[in-house]
Amino acid sequence: MQLYNCNATCSTRDLISYNTRLFWIDGTYYILYIYPSDTSKMHIRKYIKWLHDNDCDAHADIVQHMYNLGIKSKKSFVVYSLIADKYKAVDDYRHFVK
């Protein structure tokens, strides 16, 4: 689905901006890529709004927390483990996702 008149597509499971995955679900992990551009950050914020508008409030709150943590920590990725209910800001998500 096109995201609010911009060059990004999304579903509840992913967000793609200019052919770059910014958010996706890998098994029981949510992964957010804080790509270093204002446009990508704007697309993440629009994605959070889209989730709220589509009655995915709990999901939107998780992504919002991931976004805030990523901006604060200045790391490239934020990973959320659904099973452990744990957030981690990392430079390379592959070390966290097992």
Where are these regions (language model features)?
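Terminal leader/tail segments of proteins
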Residues: M1-K98
